[in-house]
UniProtKB/Swiss-Prot annotation:
Keyword Iron among record annotations: yes
Xref: InterPro entries: CyaY (IPR047584), Frataxin/CyaY (IPR002908), Frataxin/CyaY_sf (IPR036524)
Cellular component annotations (GO), alphabetically ordered: cytoplasm
Domain of life: Bacteria
Protein name: Iron-sulfur cluster assembly protein CyaY
Gene coding for it: cyaY
Keywords associated with the record: Iron, Metal-binding
PROSITE patterns: FRATAXIN_2
Length: 105
């Protein structure tokens, strides 16, 4: 995958996450900053940070539960450790951090 393809796919993923956060009812604040960094802040002031890492061609997620790297497999973004899909993993991480069920679609 070349840089332009990675950037397009990463931007689509970040936009999808942003739209899913808009649609959920959870008590959280979020902002997608230029350059591909998405900060999600929870009621307890903890954060999840989602950003693209162009050199590795991965999307990185930093949460209270740890750091996660997602790589494009040709169809979806998958965790490099357990092969979990990005939106499913973010839903799990956000639910753990918020203390309530959060489903991002």
């Amino acid at each position: 995958m070349d840089d332009s393809e990675f950037n397009a796919l990463a931007e689509q993923a970040l936009a999808r996450i942003d739209a899913a956060l808009e649609a959920c009812d959870a008590d959280l604040d979020f902002e997608l900053a230029p350059g591909g960094v998405l900060e999600i802040e929870f009621a307890d002031r903890s954060k999840i940070i989602v950003n693209r890492h162009s050199i590795a061609k991965e999307i990185w997620v930093a949460a209270r539960a740890g750091g996660f790297h997602f790589r494009w497999d040709g169809a979806s973004w998958r965790d490099t450790r357990d092969n979990a899909e990005l939106m499913e993993k973010l839903s799990t991480l956000a639910s753990q951090q918020a203390g309530e069920a959060i489903v991002l679609r």
